């Protein structure tokens, strides 16, 4: 929407942060699980899995990523329901029983939303919604689909599946609190339940599938991050680079992103906290500018595919993204960040010049 290389670079960095958070989160989750099962220090395990992720992605590409996701995804879904069956058995698959057990351990507030402020619910919803909109891995698959109907159906199915499995996983965490209120580390809730309530054969299969799912998700995100950085940070500023050179840059960037993912996993307090910061930073800055660009069109000009009809100027986009990201990460939160980002984008665009029409299409965002 903006013919500006600087805006494109800022956007690339922010969206890459989401991928870094996802890769780091996968490694941190595996480290926490392994720590519960073996009692080992999770940090070396986190580093080991990140090295495996890097090598796996470095040697492959998007084609292998897609087929890996598809085949492993089918197996993961089947055994996920088996795992959830055992995980929810301690409360007899009943929300009423769960609520009763929570009340017995003094955690009844976990079974209801009545004590959660509306502002907190809205903030978490916007963080997740806008963060997903800024995640390149979903756009990558949409653009790779054979037509718009396939892309729309695929996103709808994956969205429904995400809601179901995330909800079930959250319930598993609440069940763990009900049956073991003295668990010190909340990050180890699911591994503890697996170790104590799931049969050994199911545990072995589920752990293997968790590793497979982590590999699948991590290589997708590493691949996406390297593509983002090549297309948005290197290609606009070095248009004469050959495809072979760009592929080489992507391979090196896979390693660099993997290193940053390891650091993020080691120093983050929790997986949710890691995701939340990345989603807040990217969603609070990029998505408001995207929405303004889609809605605020030049009057009197018919829409033409492949051309820019938005009234956003380069400086409007730059400042809107930066201000939105900074405010979203501050104590004001993402709701204020989104609103202020949109206002800044419009106001600055009204008082700054537009990009020259002679600039080539390679600089479009």
Residue ranges and their predicted role:
Residues 1-365:
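Membrane-embedded helix-loop-helix hairpins and adjacent transmembrane boundary segments
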